[in-house]
Amino acid sequence: MQHSKRDNTWSKWGFFLGVAVALGALVVVGWTFMQNRFQPGSSLDADVTIGIDDMPQSLDIRSDSSAAAERLLVDNVYETLVTVDQDNKLQPGLATSWKTSDDGLTVTLTLQSGVTFSNGHTLDASDAVWSLQQNVTNKVADVDELGDLASVANPNATTVVITLAKPNPTLLRALSGRLGIVYDSESSSADYQRKAIGSGPFTVADFQPGHSLKLARSDTYHGTKAASNVVEFMQYSDADALSKALTDGSLDMAAPVSASTATGLNGKDGLTVKEGATTDKVLLAYNNGTDSLLSDEQARKAFRYQIDAAGIASAQPDAAGALGGPISLLEPGYEDLTGLYPHDENQAGQMFSYFGAQYLTTVNLVVPEEYRSLAETIKQQIERQPRPTVNLEVLSDEDYAKRIKDGKWELTVMSMDGTDDAGIFADPDSMFHYDHTEAQQAYADARAATNDADYEARMKAYARLISEDAASDWLYTRKCFTVASTKVSGYPTSMINRRMPLAGVDGEVGNLQSRTGYAR
């Protein structure tokens, strides 16, 4: 560009005047920034420390299939093509929008532009394609959730086209978790077990497996910068130590905590306890195998009438509400099915009376220690009838897992925590050994859906069918608990057992302690 030399004197004066004005503005802006940077109460310097009960052993989510790795790193260090909100609804992630073809075989995602990884490399559609291909090649945990991929391509820098051999109505859901993480294709040789190269609002500042994970704000993040400078997770294996650390100020927050811990800390000065929704479902599971009493439809239904599921839900401190079916309130296809089997001991007694004394004798209720109390309640409720009696066995986790695998049980108390996990009842080889032709067809129909509306409607029909047939007794959905200092804000409260986005977590500087050591 050429510059005119006319009115050169005025140009010089204009230049000096402009410099003076600019310097003055910089002084004002700098003074304001310094005040905001250092004044007590500013979030810019806040360090928030969070207590958790499990820590990943590796930062590589592809090789560490633990829930902890995904919960702490996704949305914080790594970003996914699609994400979910606090109501478990799909929301734009790295992909600002997507479109599914009418036949359900092509999904086109449009990516944000101007995104970089924490190492400065540009993130574009080629990285997304490479990441998806790596998931398949390396058989990453849950890779089957991607469905039958025919091809993955990037026609340009901001477009990803996924072609399927057959419809997968939950593909976008899969892309909101570990399978949807976009990695840097130019850093394929990096040691991801100890190093994280993501595009999220935080970077990993330090990682001590089994002890701590420190996240630092990424100043190059493409979105709204994290509210806190540092977020550090500390592992506590003892609930009493965790509670003490919260009350003495060694921790600013703990999530998720048990119902008993939340109850014990409720009302403590300087702390607040919040509840949130989950997809965690607690059920009295039935062994429907041919050698089990529960292979008989009449027996299954009698147990459902006999068990006071609503009463159990109202009494359990971690219960958000009675359930009645395999799909929770936050999952596609939910319907309130609690009215199918209202508590009716007279009805149960009549149904049990059809069985001879030598057939209806004793059922084995096998549980791990965590469900001892609930199992004792269930045993008492069943034994209000003359038959059957209940042989309750509380086992170690190892022995329990073996008994379930060997199929030597009739009843057990367990939880299922996953969106779209109801399909397990369509698998006759699952632990439930539930073999129902109509249910299998209903689930296959749902999986063949080419749009969300059809999928939800068909899942609702499937859920009603297996609940009416009493494949198990779904007791209640769980709620989760967060305990935090009253000086901390902006943290999530729902779904925190699955993911914990912390870009908005904020604390008042001067109220949150600067720490070099932690009470264990």
Protein language model features and the residues they cover:
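Surface-exposed binding/hinge segments that line
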Residues: D144-S185, D206
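Long beta-strand-rich cores associated with HINT superfamily self-processing modules
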Residues: T482-R520
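Ligand-site clamp/hinge motif
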Residues: D219-G264
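N-terminal lobe/hinge region of extracytoplasmic solute-binding protein
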Residues: G51-D102, Q133, I197
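Periplasmic-binding protein-like
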Residues: T290-E331, L374, I466-A471
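Gly/Pro-rich hinge or "lid" segments in bacterial periplasmic/extracellular proteins
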Residues: A68, R173-K225, V230, D240, ...
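Structural transition elements
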Residues: D318-F355, R372-S373
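Extracytoplasmic/peripheral linker and loop segments enriched in polar/acidic and small residues
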Residues: Q2-H3, D7, G18-A22, Q35, ...
